């Protein structure tokens, strides 16, 4: 199946978007409907390292995690929860491990659903194992194991299928260290999109075959890397104005999953999901202030603005004063959702949405671009050339630059360092050709010679 490209927006304007409501809600798991008028907490966790020593230890660890979460949700009176299991390498390299974990988790979830009526679903995020020690091996021997991991998990209890895919990462790592804007465009917007179409066409087939949900991807490997290198307001390893361009380019790349059959909810660490929601109308999971257990960011309230599920990134399972980590963080997420759901019920959702957005809007260029009104503009620039993976990524990057420039003329403060990086990036973008074939040929020649670990055959070249 060829990907069906988006050439129009799902919403007539940005103000139509809010949290807990999507154009195309998703039914999943045990009586859960996502994006259907209420927000849902989605707890994300990691086993302790020693639990990976054997399959039996790993299953026991996930049984404890699942029981702790379900018990706490019922104990405090929350009506719904999604559990996200991000695979450790052993679970994807050995698909039966992931499958047995999924089965063990779902058995516990069914018990709590049957006894207490709590609505719930299980997401499994398969590890992108398509690499060897030296370089990515996206279409090699590991691809069949990668797909088998999806299929076995889907057959054994997972409701939502996701991955944080790595396509383009080898060129991105080279480009981001050199402030190479064409390299960011090529790695995320072009190589990433090519790989996404391959894998999400196959994942969506598995979901259809198994009666599960092809949920979505995230550009964690690239846009989040740029965000992390950028750091906070004291850091100068990477200009935040470059990190935000990487984020804008990641939106058309993450969009490909939905063009190839995914239906949401998009995965939590895709900060670009607000743009994807504006284009597709599909439900999205977001993370922000509740992901401080895993990393800091500069837009912790703002990203709640239009979420359908609200997540915490990931937390290692261990004890805290208030219970285990998964109990503490799932309760925090659920209280945030209770507030959003009350706002929806009392028709104050847009007031709360705008307060969350305004609290971070001018903190950083990354927050400014992801404010829902500006994110909508980036979406419009993408669908304008929706059939061309190069032009739509280039459009997103240039529109991002325009938005930040407009912000800097107002309340958004940029240092000289950030301002110069933005001007240089925009000049580099405007110097690029409009012809996709020329851009792709030029980049293939350049990065094939400069990046030793870049294997064009990974992308069908």
From Swiss-Prot:
Disulfide bonds: none annotated. It comes from the Archaea. Zn(2+) binds at residues 164, 220, 269. One of its GO terms (molecular function) is methanol-5-hydroxybenzimidazolylcobamide Co-methyltransferase activity. It catalyses: Co(I)-[methanol-specific corrinoid protein] + methanol + H(+) = methyl-Co(III)-[methanol-specific corrinoid protein] + H2O. Pfam families: MtaB (PF12176). Its EC number is 2.1.1.90. Keywords: Metal-binding, Methyltransferase, Transferase, Zinc. GO terms for biological process: methylation. Belongs to the MtaB family. Methyltransferase involved in methanogenesis in the methanol pathway. Catalyzes the methylation of the MtaC-bound cob(I)amide. Heterotetramer, composed of 2 MtaB and 2 MtaC subunits. This is Methanol--corrinoid protein co-methyltransferase.
